């Protein structure tokens, strides 16, 4: 392996292992650039995990001929679409960093309850063997976003919008067609919401710290 790629991989792993700053005034304080880099890496990892889980579930349980029609039904509707959040990179660039952080936090927090049931639903024969750690990873990203909010809001983040609705828990009755459709829809929303959160964080990081990876 060339020195350049190997160094990048080691750096990424090191950033994933870094703890977040617990207090704004803590010493030594983590630079803002590192906070953003840490958050982006965690969001990318979660988004990829969600995408892999969705694909594996689809391959295992959803007949190929039914996938398109199911994706266009109410089961595929994500309630997060009712939040006035940007739907893509271009819209995200029109919002302030604080707004994007609040939207990211809302998206992450809306899944903290439902994902606790993932490990009860999926078997270890699938990719879901890591599902019992998804909650921990989401909590870690939530903490990172809150650390960024403290930095950008001078240590006193204002109360954000409170979600009046959250996602249902995953259905453990995998022999039911209704349960399969429900879980399929939830996994689709989970993937979409994590993609949004990742996009928001990458937009913020790129416009604050111009770099070659800004093209996405």
From Swiss-Prot:
Disulphide bonds in the chain: 78-189, 206-214
Gene Ontology CC annotation, any one: extracellular space
Localization per record: Secreted
Signal peptide (residue range): 1-26
Pfam families for this protein: Hormone_1
InterPro entries, A to Z: 4_helix_cytokine-like_core, Somatotropin, Somatotropin/Prolactin, Somatotropin_CS
Gene Ontology molecular function: any one: hormone activity
Modified sites of kind Phosphoserine: 131
Keywords: Disulfide bond, Hormone, Metal-binding, Phosphoprotein, Secreted, Signal, Zinc
PROSITE patterns the record matches: SOMATOTROPIN_1, SOMATOTROPIN_2
Binding residue positions for Zn(2+): 45, 198
Domain of life per record: Eukaryota
GO biological process: animal organ development; growth hormone receptor signaling pathway; positive regulation of growth; positive regulation of receptor signaling pathway via JAK-STAT; response to nutrient levels
Function (record text): Plays an important role in growth control. Its major role in stimulating body growth is to stimulate the liver and other tissues to secrete IGF1. It stimulates both the differentiation and proliferation of myoblasts. It also stimulates amino acid uptake and protein synthesis in muscle and other tissues.
Family, similarity comment: Belongs to the somatotropin/prolactin family.
Protein name per its UniProtKB record: Somatotropin
Originating species: Hippopotamus amphibius (Hippopotamus)
Originating gene: GH1
């Amino acid at each position: 392996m060339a020195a350049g790629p190997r160094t990048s991989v080691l750096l990424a792993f090191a950033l994933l292992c870094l703890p977040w700053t617990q207090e704004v005034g803590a010493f030594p304080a983590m630079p803002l650039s590192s906070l953003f880099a840490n958050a982006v890496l965690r969001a990318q990892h979660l988004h990829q995990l969600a995408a892999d889980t969705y694909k594996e579930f689809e391959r295992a349980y959803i007949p190929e001929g039914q996938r398109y029609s199911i994706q266009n039904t109410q089961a595929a509707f994500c309630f997060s679409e009712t939040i006035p959040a940007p739907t893509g990179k271009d819209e995200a660039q029109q919002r302030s960093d604080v707004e994007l952080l609040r939207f990211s936090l809302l998206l992450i927090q809306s899944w903290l309850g439902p994902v606790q049931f993932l490990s009860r639903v999926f078997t270890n024969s699938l990719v879901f063997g890591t599902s019992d750690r998804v909650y921990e990873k989401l909590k870690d990203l939530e903490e990172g976003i809150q650390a960024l909010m403290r930095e950008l809001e001078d240590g006193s983040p204002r109360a954000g919008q409170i979600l009046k609705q959250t996602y249902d828990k995953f259905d453990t009755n995998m022999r039911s067609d209704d349960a399969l459709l429900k879980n399929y829809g939830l996994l689709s929303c989970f993937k979409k919401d994590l993609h949004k959160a990742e996009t928001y964080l990458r937009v913020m990081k790129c416009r604050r710290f111009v770099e070659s990876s800004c093209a996405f």
